[in-house]
């Protein structure tokens, strides 16, 4: 009936997996984990493929592009904030 063709369907984009936010850096054999970009922060770290980045460095990298400047992979944008207990549970 109409002369217009329907638009082809867009491919489904799977959502990026959620990455957990580390409030405190995990201790390791060689000391604490730090942000691999600024080498200063050891709190509020997000895991990016094989290293950790702080929130400040992630936001500054996202302003410049979508890929990590250290490993070249996509920067994690979906962050899961875990609930940490603030007091011991009552029995």
UniProtKB/Swiss-Prot annotation:
Pfam family membership, one: zf-P11
Short sequence motif PTAP/PSAP motif: positions: 85-88
Cellular component per GO, a single term: host cell perinuclear region of cytoplasm
UniProt KW Zinc keyword: yes
Main subcellular location: virion
Location within or outside the cell: Virion; Host cytoplasm, Host perinuclear region; Host cell membrane
UniProt KW Ion transport keyword: no
ZnF region ranges: RING-type: 35-71
Keywords: Host cell membrane, Host cytoplasm, Host membrane, Host-virus interaction, Lipoprotein, Membrane, Metal-binding, Myristate, Viral budding, Viral budding via the host ESCRT complexes, Viral release from host cell, Virion, Zinc, Zinc-finger
Family: Belongs to the arenaviridae Z protein family.
Notes on the domains: Late-budding domains (L domains) are short sequence motifs essential for viral particle budding. They recruit proteins of the host ESCRT machinery (Endosomal Sorting Complex Required for Transport) or ESCRT-associated proteins.
Reported function: Plays a crucial role in virion assembly and budding. Expressed late in the virus life cycle, it acts as an inhibitor of viral transcription and RNA synthesis by interacting with the viral polymerase L. Presumably recruits the NP encapsidated genome to cellular membranes at budding sites via direct interaction with NP. Plays critical roles in the final steps of viral release by interacting with host TSG101, a member of the vacuolar protein-sorting pathway and using other cellular host proteins involved in vesicle formation pathway.
Identification of the protein by name: RING finger protein Z
């Amino acid at each position: 009936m109409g002369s217009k063709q329907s638009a082809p369907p867009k491919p489904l984009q799977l959502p990026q997996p959620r990455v957990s936010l580390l409030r405190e850096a995990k201790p390791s054999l060689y000391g604490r984990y730090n942000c691999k970009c600024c080498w200063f922060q050891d709190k509020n770290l997000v895991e990016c493929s094989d290293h950790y980045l702080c929130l400040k460095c992630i936001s500054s990298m996202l302003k410049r592009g979508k890929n990590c400047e250290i490993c070249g992979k996509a920067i994690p944008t979906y962050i899961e904030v875990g609930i940490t207990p603030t007091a011991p549970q009552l029995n």
